[in-house]
From Swiss-Prot:
Keyword terms of this UniProt record: Amphibian defense peptide, Antibiotic, Antimicrobial, Membrane, Secreted, Signal, Target cell membrane, Target membrane
Keyword Acetylation among UniProt keywords: no
Protein name, as recorded: Aurein-5.2
Pro-peptide region(s): 23-46
Amino acid sequence: MAFLKKSLFLVLFLGLVSLSICEQEKREEENQEEDEENEAASEEKRGLMSSIGKALGGLIVDVLKPKTPAS
């Protein structure tokens, strides 16, 4: 009977350890996916801000450019 108890405890312990490892790997994968999504969103924002900056810069240059009188 004691042998069966020890075997059962061993099986339960190994099952819990493997379950814990699987959950940890799953969390790591989810964190990697979130990081990739955040990185992609950050790149989109940088691209948008860059294009807006270029457009506004060109507009400001055109507005501040001295106008020559037409002859």
